[in-house]
Structures are given as structure tokens and as C-alpha cells.
Amino acid sequence: MFGEQLLKNPLIEFCDSVCRGCGQVMFQNNTVTGLLFFAGIFYNSTTLGVCAVLGTAASTLTAQLLGVDKPLVRAGLFGFNGTLAGIALPFFFNYEPAMLGYVALNGAFTTIIMASLLNFLGKWGVPALTAPFVLATWLLMFGVYKLSLFHPGALIAPALPSVAGLADMGTVTGRTFMEGLFKGVGEVMFQDNIVTGVIFVVAILVNSRISALFAVIGSLVGLCTALIMHSPETPVRLGLYGFNSVLCGIAMGGIFFYLNIRTFLYALGCMVLGAIATGAFSVLLSPIGMPALTWPFIVVTWLFLFAGSMFRNIAQVPTEKAGTPEDNLRSLAIGSR
């Protein structure tokens, strides 16, 4: 009773929406999950933590001010792209206090793009995923090169693809798997920290055991796919081939498809392709100094979702009804009675 009254307070309601927005980065509509995600980011970097909160708050507030349907805002669906957009700027550019205004601007811009994509993709029942974050961030990053707003970091220096870097393959050890597994989860939000990765897995576990399992499976599949395809050890250990597969795994592992053996194998294929696409888009974009971000996850997941409507042997969850994998299975069981 007290909790319900507390949530009616506009400030508390807004903070709850912000936390849920952060949780939705990995499809978790849960306040505690979002708080733990924020905690994991702050554990790794105070600067990235502040920008994550600011970006999420900016995108959520913009949605409220523009009159987006309240249930969508309260579920955090207009917050998660702001989270990623907020973190990306200080991650790829040398941080300075003036950047905070652009963090808020980037977060707010994701709301405009999100609304546009929902109107466009909603006709086919396909979610926008993290496309608003990628499009908004790419636009601002390209602008930085022309307008010299900030100083780009070493991570986005233009470079032609070369096989010379493949000469030093490194040695795969147990450390490669341990670090790569959890850093793959952490890198979903640009966190190169094994403890943060563990916190993220626990945060997902709070809301869904199945999603937590698929996050770990996705990271492992991305890691193994990269090693099988003879990737150098360092990017694998850093989780750089895991994070897109993590998102593919969670999305396909019971969120947008009812989970069974067929959809598990379908999700597995999506995870493998997510890792391959990570390498492909990284090569494609490196000459212009742009990071692939979560674009590999977006493209591969969209392909699998659009294709899913053609396959009679896998049952797709209507986008507007998608919940946790456990909730989706319960709904399916009730509907079949």
C-alpha cells in the first residue's frame, strides 16, 4: 500500500522509469535490475556512471515532455537507448565537463529516433532495439570530426583493414575464457571490467533466470565463434566478440520467441551470426573511424525476426506482448488450455 502511494510521487515515478530504462538495455523491465546495472557501471567508472544516468534521464524526460504514452515511458522503453548514448560519448572521446550537455542532447535525440522507428517498424511488429542509440551516436560522432566539438580517442582513429595485426594471435588460456565470458556481458554497456560483468549477470538474474542464462550463453558463443574463426586472443579476452551475441541471445532466447528446442537452435544461430557480423561491420567501418557499436546485433536480430514470420515451426511472441521468457511461457500455457 505504502509502496503504491510512493510510486505515485512524480519524482519517485520518474526515477523508477529511469532505472527501468537502464534495465531495458538488456530487455529487463525491472527497477532493481536497472539499479544494479547503474551500480556496475559506477563500479568501473564514475564518469561513465554519471553519463549513463544523465543520458537515461534525458531520453526519459524528453519522452514525457513530448507526450509519449505513459505505459511505454514507465516500462523504460524510451530510456535504454539514452543509457547507451550517454555512455558512448565519454567512452570514445576525451572527457571534459562541457560534454555533459551533449550527453543529454544525444540521449534526448534517441527519443525522437525511437518514436520514428516505432511508427515505421511497428507495421511489421518488429522492435526498434538499440537502433536509436546507434544512429544518434554515429550522427554526433561524424559531426565531431567536422566541427571539432571534442577530441576523439584512440578507439575511433580511422584505419584501413590489415592482416598484419593477425600475425600476433596470442595464446588462448583459461583466462581468455573467464575474462572474455564476463567482459562480453559488461561490454554491452562499454564496461571493460570482469566484476561489472558479473554484476550485470546477477542483475539480469533478479528479473529472469532464463535471460541470465542466455546472456552467459551468448557471451560464450560469441567468444567461441571468434576463436574458431582464428581471431587474435586479445579482443576475444576483452569481450569484444561477445556483447552483440549477448544481446542476440537474450532477445531470441525467450523474449521474442516462445522458448523450446527449435527456438533455442534458432537463437544459437543468431548468436553465432552476431559474432561474425561484429567482425564484418568493424572492418567495414574502421576506414571512417566509426565503431560498430550494437549495429551487428540490430541487423542480425532484425533479419531473424523478419524471417521468423515465415517459419511455421517456431512460435513468435507478439512484440507488444513480449515479457520475460518465463512470463511468455506462462502466457502460452494459459492460452493453450
Curated annotation (Swiss-Prot):
Membrane topology (Cytoplasmic): 1-10, 309-337
Primary location: membrane
GO annotation, biological process: protein homotrimerization; urea transmembrane transport
Intracellular or extracellular location(s): Cell membrane
Keyword terms, alphabetized: Cell membrane, Membrane, Transmembrane, Transmembrane helix, Transport
Matching InterPro entries: Ammonium/urea_transptr, Urea_transporter
Intramembrane intervals: 11-26, 31-43, 172-189, 194-205
Coiled-coil boundaries: none
TM region positions: 47-66, 71-93, 99-121, 126-146, 210-229, 238-258, 264-285, 288-308
Membrane topology: Multi-pass membrane protein
Site feature Important for channel permeability, where: T294
Cellular component terms (Gene Ontology): plasma membrane
Disulphide bridges, residue numbers: none
Domain of life: Bacteria
Keyword Transmembrane helix belongs to the record: yes
Pfam families: UT
Known function: Urea channel that facilitates transmembrane urea transport down a concentration gradient.
Entry's family note: Belongs to the urea transporter family.
Subunit structure: Homotrimer; each subunit contains a pore through which urea permeates.
Protein name, entry field: Urea transporter DVU1160
Source organism (scientific name): Nitratidesulfovibrio vulgaris (strain ATCC 29579 / DSM 644 / CCUG 34227 / NCIMB 8303 / VKM B-1760 / Hildenborough)
